[in-house]
Amino acid sequence: RSGDLELYTMNLDGSNVKQITNVLGYDGGAFFSPDGSKIIFRASRPKTDEEVEEYTSLLSEGLVQPTEMELFICNSDGSDLKQITFLGNSNWSPFFHPSGDKIVFSSNYESTMGFPFNIYMIDVDGKNLKRITYGKTFDSFPVFSNDGTRLAFSSNRNNGGNRDTNVFIADWKD
């Protein structure tokens, strides 16, 4: 719609389309907070003139280059936009804890080679980062059960080296 990869909301019937983000860069992977008042998402933001040129050139061809992504949170109408991670590398697949006070997400920020990806938790204000998984491959797409007693995630662990990705469900205790 805008020529950039922005976030929008709309009614289930497709009416009442509203643009939520309006900053150059790739915005995606959005989820609403349990009460519907906030949106958490991943985004890349080209900073230098060279990065802007590369981003817009690829976008004109319908492409996006894998790049650093950070997590952003805003009100469900797009107001009060804040970046909550400043970790570098790829921080993505965010999901709200049922309390609405914390976010689980996947990141490779501790990696120098691009892997592994592990699951982390952070407060919605960007404080109290905590590592949740300690895998050596790929742990991602974390989601909580509605009652907060289980965490499901995808992982390449225990796959016998064949690159299969499986779903794991873990009991969760706050």
Residue spans for each PLM region:
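Residue-level detector of Asp-centered blade-edge/turn motifs that repeat once per structural unit
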Residues: P34-D35, P98-S99, N146-D147
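A structural signal for the main folded, soluble domain(s) of proteins
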Residues: M10, K18, F31, R42-A43, ...
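Hydrophobic beta-strand positions that form the internal "hydrophobic ladder"
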Residues: I39, I103-V104, L151
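Short loop/turn segments that connect beta-strands within beta-propeller blades
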Residues: N11-S15, N75-S79, D123-K127, W172-D174
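Active/binding-pocket-proximal capping segment
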Residues: G88-S90, S99, V124
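A flexible loop/linker signature enriched in serine peptidases of the S9 family
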Residues: R1-E6, T21-Y26, R42-E70, Q83-N91, ...
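A short pocket-lining beta-strand/turn micro-motif at the edge of beta-sheets
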Residues: F117, N128, F138-S140, D147-L151
